[in-house]
Amino acid sequence: MRNVKIAAIQMQCSTNLQANLEKAEKMVRQAAGDGAQIILLPELFEREYFCQQRRYDFYHLAKPVEENDAVQMGMRLAKELNVVLPVSFYEQDVNTLYNSIACIDADGTLLGVYRKTHIPDDHYYQEKFYFTPGNTGFKVFDTHFGKIGIGICWDQWFPEAARCMALMGAEILLYPTAIGSEPILECDSMPHWRRCMQGHAAANLMPVIAANRIGREEVTPSPENGGQSSALVFYGSSFMTDETGELKACASRDQE
């Protein structure tokens, strides 16, 4: 058994791509300065959660992995800081679009890409409009600091995903996430969300780390979105468990 120090970054995202990248870089540097060896950023942190609305012009936000700004930033920082850095991004592969993770090793090498398997299609979590279900299968990455399995947000609700990665040799499970208020049901899903992943840790005897965003994100009516007006409040609560599922660290609902 070896000790690995992991950081989960919880941040608020804006409509300004460059500002989000600069904030992410600042927080990655801070985590590395505190000794973190694996640093997890939230899902799709480059922008506000654009899947709240359906806009055909947002398809152009997707880029091939080698052209994505966040991935390029991640490769640079991973090499400079000697950290493992999974980076969530909107991927274009020829004519198909995916919700993906690029796993970057501590020497800046791109180890590979995992494409999100489970795609939600609920009010204001309208991901099937933007993403095709992934074709990579679940993946485990053999990094400098250990073998990590990575699921993306809605993947976290399915025990089969965690079990598959455990059987593939994962030692740690990571879940970058963008989750918040329920637009139809008047309920707080956070405790259920967290307990579900605690169960994955307990059942598979490995630590689980989840990184979520925070803040209220609003959609204003426009011709491009068919006049939609809506809002989601992302509830943060990023956390880490040990291998028995016991909570070891948990962030607040509204602080970075």
Which residues fall in each region the model found?
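N-terminal active-site segment of His-dependent metallophosphoesterases
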Residues: 1-38, 174
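Beta-strand-turn-beta hairpins that frame and shape the catalytic cleft
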Residues: 1-6, 140-149, 172
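Short, glycine-anchored, charge-dense loop/turn motifs used at functional sites
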Residues: 6, 103-111, 239-249
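Cys-nucleophile CN-hydrolase/nitrilase-fold catalytic domain and related Cys-dependent amidase chemistry
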Residues: 17, 26-113, 179-199, 203-206
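Short glycine/proline- and charge-enriched loop/turn segments
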Residues: 53-61, 122-123, 223-228
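CN hydrolase (nitrilase-like) catalytic-core segments centered on the catalytic cysteine
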Residues: 66-86, 153-256
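A short, polar/charged loop-to-alpha-helix boundary motif
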Residues: 116-130, 255-256
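Active-site glycine-rich loop that binds ribose-phosphate moieties when present
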Residues: 123-139, 156-158
